[in-house]
From Swiss-Prot:
Gene for this chain: NMUR2
Glycosylation sites: N9, N27, N194
Residues passing through the membrane, by range: 50-70, 83-103, 124-146, 166-186, 215-235, 266-286, 302-322
Identification of the protein by name: Neuromedin-U receptor 2
UniProt keyword annotation of Disulfide bond present: yes
Cytoplasmic-facing ranges: 71-82, 147-165, 236-265, 323-415
Lineage, highest ranks first: Eukaryota, Metazoa, Chordata, Craniata, Vertebrata
């Protein structure tokens, strides 16, 4: 992706290896620019843009809903959900700032119009959100590991304040580790053989020796993908063994632990989240490592790189849009909270466009069922209490309490 210091028109790599005498056949500045930088507009602009539009819409709406659900509903403010909130913020930054910039650069690859500051910001943004995403995924996996294998320690240590401190460290480290790659980028200008500046040739690219860039990419791919994915895989394997052991003990003793189905549900959701994350980010890191390891480019290698480059971009942005869908499909609590937020917006819209509607018709009926843990929402049913609310989940429940809330929205005289 262009947002990931990659060039949208990788075909120029092979073109640059042509003999210098070819340059004398170039009859215009535009032809000379195309020779140096590749086509001004990517050949993939139209099909990729068509794919990006639904990803953008679904991703922005979904991640905004995730943020609203966690911010507005006290019952959703759990340590685990705070890490998911961090992931949603990271995804929103990618979709709102990164995707439009990449689409623009595919439409007009040069000149880069935002100057050195814009170049630094673009590089730092993508590096930071990449690192913050994988660190958030790793942190929530460690939290679940502690909750499953050391539940008493988790009850004492897993607090919202601690989660916020950890997230501060995560984002601080992400910004810090983005600096090396950012520092080697800048605006590059091209010149005619006589030394005069080629108009409109400014590009945001690597301006330091390529071996530095290659080294940074290889180190960060190991530290922020291969190593975390290995650690996460080991953690989920150990969690699976523990849950299997607990199930066997319960079968032997004839006791059913009501928390086990809930933990299994949450672990299933987080496991799917990690699996999708790993699959979607694999092409991105393959793309980066491909570019960093190849020293002698050929036409066939450039063609393969172009294909990998486009696929990696689609999967990268897809990972930012799919998380809210996973929450909605695998977590009844998130599903109910999403419906509650949407109903709240629907109620406000009705209030503005139909002010004569009686207030009683704009209430949301909430059925509260107290259960095991705020993020663990599948298990036996408990007696329920019904009450009338406007739009918020009950605020009296603490993160250590275990509750379950189902929501049903009613409009009594539907128009």
């Amino acid at each position: 992706m262009s947002g990931m210091e990659k060039l949208q028109n990788a075909s120029w790599i092979y073109q640059q290896k042509l003999e210098d005498p070819f340059q004398k056949h170039l009859n215009s500045t535009e032809e000379y620019l195309a020779f140096l930088c590749g086509p001004r507009r990517s050949h993939f602009f139209l099909p990729v843009s068509v794919v990006y539009v639904p990803i953008f819409v679904v991703g922005v709406i979904g991640n905004v809903l995730v943020c609203l659900v966690i911010l507005q509903h006290q019952a959703m403010k759990t340590p685990t959900n705070y890490y998911l909130f961090s992931l949603a913020v990271s995804d929103l930054l990618v979709l709102l700032l990164g995707m439009p910039l990449e689409v623009y650069e595919m439409w007009r690859n040069y000149p880069f119009l935002f100057g050195p500051v814009g170049c630094y910001f673009k590089t730092a943004l993508f590096e930071t959100v990449c690192f913050a995403s994988i660190l958030s995924i790793t942190t929530v996996s460690v939290e679940r590991y502690v909750a499953i294998l050391h539940p008493f320690r988790a009850k004492l240590q897993s607090t919202r304040r601690r989660a916020l401190r950890i997230l501060g460290i995560v984002w601080g480290f992400s910004v810090l580790f983005s600096l090396p790659n950012t520092s080697i980028h800048g605006i590059k200008f091209h010149y005619f053989p006589n030394g005069s500046l080629v108009p409109g040739s400014a590009t945001c690219t690597v301006i330091k020796p390529m071996w530095i860039y290659n080294f940074i990419i290889q180190v960060t791919s190991f530290l922020f993908y291969l190593l975390p994915m290995t650690v996460i895989s080991v953690l989920y394997y150990l969690m699976a063994l523990r849950l299997k052991k607990d199930k066997s003990l319960e079968a032997d003793e004839g006791n059913a632990n009501i928390q086990r189905p809930c933990r299994k549900s949450v672990n299933k959701m987080l496991f799917v989240l990690v699996l999708v994350f790993a699959i979607c980010w694999a092409p991105f890191h393959i793309d980066r490592l491909f570019f960093s390891f190849v020293e002698e480019w050929s036409e066939s290698l450039a063609a393969v790189f172009n294909l990998v480059h486009v696929v990696s971009g689609v999967f990268f942005y897809l990972s930012s849009a799919v998380n809210p869908i996973i929450y909605n499909l695998l977590s009844r609590r998130f599903q109910a909270a999403f419906q509650n937020v949407i109903s709240s917006f629907h109620k406000q819209w009705h209030s503005q466009h139909d002010p004569q509607l009686p207030p009683a018709q704009r209430n949301i009926f909430l059925t509260e069922c107290h259960f095991v843990e705020l993020t663990e929402d599948i298990g036996p049913q408990f007696p329920c209490q019904s009450s009338m609310h406007n739009s918020h989940l009950p605020a009296a429940l603490s993160s250590e309490q275990m509750s379950r809330t189902n929501y049903q929205s009613f409009h009594f005289n539907k128009t």
